[in-house]
Every structure is written in C-alpha cells, then in structure tokens.
Design a protein with these regions (language model features):
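Single conserved hydrophobic/aromatic residue that forms the stacking wall/gate
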Residues: 183-192
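Intrinsically disordered, low-complexity, mixed-charge
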Residues: 1-178, 182
C-alpha cells in the first residue's frame, strides 16, 4: 500500500503498527519521500478491512495525522513474514508534506507540571501528538537523523519510550528529556 497525506512526524507508523497487530497482519511499514509505504500479509477478509480500520484508528488515536489516499499498489504472493515491523526509512525525491509544529498536548502538559515527573518543568516535552516537526526538519523522510535532533542521543529512558509500541512516544523522533543536553553528540555546527 502507498499512503499519502500528513503521515510523517505524527505517530502514523506506530498507529499503523497497532492496527496491523490488532488485525493479526504481518509485514512492514516505512517512511519515504512520498509518504508511507507498507507491505501487509494476512487473511484476505482481514486485508479488505485494513483501510477502514486504519482510517478509524488514525482519526481516534493520531490527532495530527491526515490520510489523503490509501492506494493498493500491487498484490504479490505472501513472503512469509512472521511479524509486523517498522523498518528504516527509504530515500527518494520528496513528494510529501512536512507536518507543522503542534502545541503541547494535555498529556505532555501534565508531565511538565507534575513535580517528581522526569519532565517536570522541561520546556521541550513532546510526543507523537505534539511538539516540533517543521522547525526541526532538515530533510525527509522525517526521521531523527534528518532533523536538528540528530546530534542528540536519547537517554535510556527516552529510548525505551521510543521503542515501546504501547507508549505515546513510540517512534516520536524529537523525543527528549532534561538528560538530553548532557549526552550531546559532537557535530560540526551548521549555519541555517
């Protein structure tokens, strides 16, 4: 499938991952210069429900995302995938939109104003529902190495959130916390 719209930097791949797992589909999903691509394997009746379930789940769980089109590119014999995974982004000539920055969501605001929370008073708190997108993007596909966050390694707690499908920071590229500034990766300064 080829999916276009506001589908990068909005928690779209994690949302698609959850839909695929809920429907017991296998395959993969990736960002690329045109939007998002996915290969799905599973029962034909379930595959027929995929687009409807994806649109519903995106509407309910990914408030910054917008699907413009879902196109079945081709059907092929099953490859025998045993899981559904988010794979590395693929390069190409850009034909997709960069999502605008979004105001802090309620869940992040609660963290910022809760004493004892590791993000208490941390102004750069964000998740897949809020935070910087356009202002940090250097190139697409939208992945951390293509953003101004590239020179900042995630701490182990941020990495755990990023890798956890149940977390709202699952694959949130600008994920950060106050520890971030302590583990800056040395990189030559680039003028903007």
């Amino acid at each position: 499938y080829r999916i276009t719209g506001l589908v990068q930097g909005v928690g779209f791949r994690p949302t698609l991952w959850r839909v695929a797992h809920a429907l017991k589909l296998t395959g993969e999903v990736w960002n690329d210069a045109e939007g998002v691509g996915t290969i799905l394997e599973g029962n034909v009746d379930v595959l027929d429900r995929f687009e409807e379930e994806l649109r519903k789940t995106v509407r309910d769980e990914a408030p910054l995302a917008r699907i413009d089109s879902v196109e079945l590119v081709q059907t092929t014999p099953a490859l025998g995938s045993t899981d559904f995974v988010i794979t590395a982004s693929r390069q190409g000539t850009a034909h997709t939109m960069v999502t605008p920055d979004a105001a802090t969501c309620r869940a992040c605001a609660i963290e910022m104003f809760t004493p004892g929370n590791r993000r208490w008073r941390y102004a750069f708190t964000n998740c897949t529902h809020c935070g910087p997108r356009f202002t940090i993007t250097r190139s697409i596909p939208y992945d951390r190495p293509m953003t101004s966050m590239a020179s900042f390694a995630m701490c182990s707690d941020c990495r755990h959130e990023y890798d956890d499908p149940a977390d709202r920071r699952f694959h949130a590229q600008p994920n950060a916390c106050p520890i971030l500034s302590l583990i800056h990766i040395s990189e030559p300064t680039r003028p903007y």
